[in-house]
Amino acid sequence: MIQIDALPAFNDNYIWLLQDATSRRCAVVDPGDARPVEAWLAAHPDWRLSDILVTHHHHDHVGGVAALKELSGARVLGPANEKIPARDLALEDGERVEVLGLVFEIFHVPGHTLGHIAYYHAAQTPLLFCGDTLFAAGCGRLFEGTPAQMHRSLARLAALPANTRVYCTHEYTLSNLRFALAVEPENQALRERFEEATRLRERDRITLPSEISLELSTNPFLRVSENSVKKKADQRSGQQNRTPEEVFAVLRAWKDQF
């Protein structure tokens, strides 16, 4: 049984900590800062950091990798097509890798960056570590990829089992939900999610992980084929957007300025 906890970092990052109590081994995902992980390891001296999983090359995801590698000797896994510090295993789309006894399939999900990957574990309750591709009620900015690339990447993730737990890397949920409500103000599921997320943040609790089913009902970037979303995108752009990719592009540009 793997326990997953969030280690807060910077202003709004989460470093996901996977723990196998039987072996006293742990793994972390996207440690942009080594200090939260170092503090946890210092408080748990009988545990060993065995693996560091990286989704993409941005500093707030890799800034702590080298120090943690030096401290623990952990294996560093990351995308083959990006420069990742101290990487031991370069991962391509479709490959499988075992971490703490869990087998993860690698998805290449370009958009936020061109080499971005996600880690997917198929199980009764599937797990998805998706970095800055799919957020709770949102998606990552397009720093390197195109709207078409990101739309395809999100469509791939949206097709995963509805109960897949989504572990993204930022506490952007309230901001994303405010934008989502601007797109679909009459979406009752969305209004309820905003109220729940607000209550959680008021108690200083995190809003993650999410689930694919929740994203399908409330994330505008996964709802670009819905008439309500297309209508709002058409109003925003002043023209008829003929394809879901075009609707997505309008939404992403709007969110960048929101």
From Swiss-Prot:
PANTHER family (alphabetical): HYDROXYACYLGLUTATHIONE HYDROLASE, HYDROXYACYLGLUTATHIONE HYDROLASE GLOB
Binding site for Zn(2+) 2: D60, H61, D132, H170
Keyword match Hydrolase: yes
Subunit structure: Monomer.
Cofactor binding note of this UniProt entry: Binds 2 Zn(2+) ions per subunit.
Keyword Hydrolase: yes
Coiled-coil portions: none
GO MF annotation terms: hydroxyacylglutathione hydrolase activity; metal ion binding
Residue numbers binding Zn(2+) 1: H56, H58, H112, D132
Enzyme class: hydrolase
Gene: gloB
Keywords: Hydrolase, Metal-binding, Zinc
HAMAP family from the UniProt entry: Glyoxalase_2
Enzyme Commission numbers on file: 3.1.2.6
Catalytic activity of the protein: an S-(2-hydroxyacyl)glutathione + H2O = a 2-hydroxy carboxylate + glutathione + H(+)
Protein name, entry field: Hydroxyacylglutathione hydrolase
Functional pathway: Secondary metabolite metabolism; methylglyoxal degradation; (R)-lactate from methylglyoxal: step 2/2
Family indicated by similarity: Belongs to the metallo-beta-lactamase superfamily. Glyoxalase II family.
